[in-house]
Amino acid sequence: MAAAGAAATHLEVARGKRAALFFAAVAIVLGLPLWWKTTETYRASLPYSQISGLNALQLRLMVPVTVVFTRESVPLDDQEKLPFTVVHEREIPLKYKMKIKCRFQKAYRRALDHEEEALSSGSVQEAEAMLDEPQEQAEGSLTVYVISEHSSLLPQDMMSYIGPKRTAVVRGIMHREAFNIIGRRIVQVAQAMSLTEDVLAAALADHLPEDKWSAEKRRPLKSSLGYEITFSLLNPDPKSHDVYWDIEGAVRRYVQPFLNALGAAGNFSVDSQILYYAMLGVNPRFDSASSSYYLDMHSLPHVINPVESRLGSSAASLYPVLNFLLYVPELAHSPLYIQDKDGAPVATNAFHSPRWGGIMVYNVDSKTYNASVLPVRVEVDMVRVMEVFLAQLRLLFGIAQPQLPPKCLLSGPTSEGLMTWELDRLLWARSVENLATATTTLTSLAQLLGKISNIVIKDDVASEVYKAVAAVQKSAEELASGHLASAFVASQEAVTSSELAFFDPSLLHLLYFPDDQKFAIYIPLFLPMAVPILLSLVKIFLETRKSWRKPEKTD
């Protein structure tokens, strides 16, 4: 009986050892990998090497220029050399990590018969009308016509002319260095119509270090897929003024044609409102000499905040909002004028704030009060108002007057208020700005994800990053090829994808879940199971070690 009991006990101990080893094997072989897999932070692969390469990206902005020579514009020996191509390239000196080079590819050729006929007409406007082709030129391209040195197409004191479309006229010269002299003139005209240091500096104002001209360069709106424009009539004294403004007709006649011409740069929505009892929030000063009130330049920044609280247009907007306010001063503070820094009245009686909008003060004619009972009827002259607002709108979009070369004649404004080459110049600037923004966003995202290892990177986030990198590369290639329209579209895609990836909410899911919290959660689960297994393994190890050391019995 004793032998049978000892055998049973030995069998039970062996069974316990095998069970402990089995549980330990299951925990190590299956449990640990399963726990590791189910608790790991999923991080999809990202193109880190390509993103780091974007910091050394060099932009080559190619402007295709077709140069058409008429008869007697250059010496006959030079005309026999046509056609040929000349490339002029220079680096734009900006304090920015991205190197930008501007490349003017000038394709020289002789004028065709219909071009000769058009350029021999009496005025440059007639020539432009005859040269209009059914098929428009590509965005970003230019055509320069070189006319005879003694041609009457331009005033005799003018050496060049910039038209409303993508065309210009330059006087030729009978000189042995004609091509070199004319080539320099063409580059000056082409730069005024496309890319200059100031245009690109304004586009990269948020990415460049502060300097003496940064404040002015930061005036234009940042690039966006859409913009909202709000026209507001502020009538602080409705008891004295019954103001009527035909804002719908004014927008239809003046603003909408301009926005239609600007449509390639983004989507636009326009609305209007009338605000009663809306005060400027600044007490104007009285000038006894002129019996009028005035706002000096130093008080203008304090005007916007009190008024902005009444507008309510930017609170729920996804896009940048431009506010244009027409303020009819109350009777007690009429007439009201805006003074410049020298104390002189501003001719337009208006001012604008960078990336916000503009305000115009509209004074009621004093004669209106003499023969009328309050409130007086006020008919707003919308032509005068829209001239001011459209000028401010151009400035806020970065469409400023170009720096013309010497003796250059600029075409008058078009009915849309925007020349075709001005739109191209805006698209150049917006493309560069978008690439800089996308590159900065991707670089910041890569640095953030590299430093914090417990941020989840989902596949859709990685997909947006890959899209953004590909779009940046495509846009840079299209810019180098002179395809402005497709380059601008690709740059917009780059910004959109990079910001979708950077601001994806899933990146924050485990950001505030440190390792000590993980231990606090998992130890109560694993400790009750792990302790018996570990103790059994230790006991088995000690018994096995003891049996190895036990000496063999000898007779």
From Swiss-Prot:
Intervals, Lumenal compartment: 40-517
Topology of this chain in the membrane: Multi-pass membrane protein
Outcome of substituting residue 47 to A: No effect on function in GPI-anchor attachment to protein
Intrachain S-S bonds: none
Protein location: Endoplasmic reticulum membrane
Entry keyword set: Disease variant, Endoplasmic reticulum, Epilepsy, Glycoprotein, GPI-anchor biosynthesis, Membrane, Transmembrane, Transmembrane helix
Pathway(s) where this gene product acts: Glycolipid biosynthesis; glycosylphosphatidylinositol-anchor biosynthesis
Binding site for a cardiolipin: 15, 18
One cellular component term from this protein's GO annotations in UniProt: GPI-anchor transamidase complex
Transmembrane segments: 19-39, 518-532
Effect of residue 43 to A: No effect on function in GPI-anchor attachment to protein
Glycosylation sites: 267, 370
GO biological process: attachment of GPI anchor to protein; GPI anchor biosynthetic process; GPI anchored protein biosynthesis
Subunit structure: Heteropentamer. Part of the GPI-anchor transamidase complex, consisting of PIGK, PIGT, PIGS, PIGU and GAA1.
Known disease link: Glycosylphosphatidylinositol biosynthesis defect 18: An autosomal recessive disorder with onset in utero or early infancy and characterized by severe global developmental delay, seizures, hypotonia, weakness, ataxia, and dysmorphic facial features.
Stated name of the protein: GPI-anchor transamidase component PIGS
Gene name linked to the record: PIGS
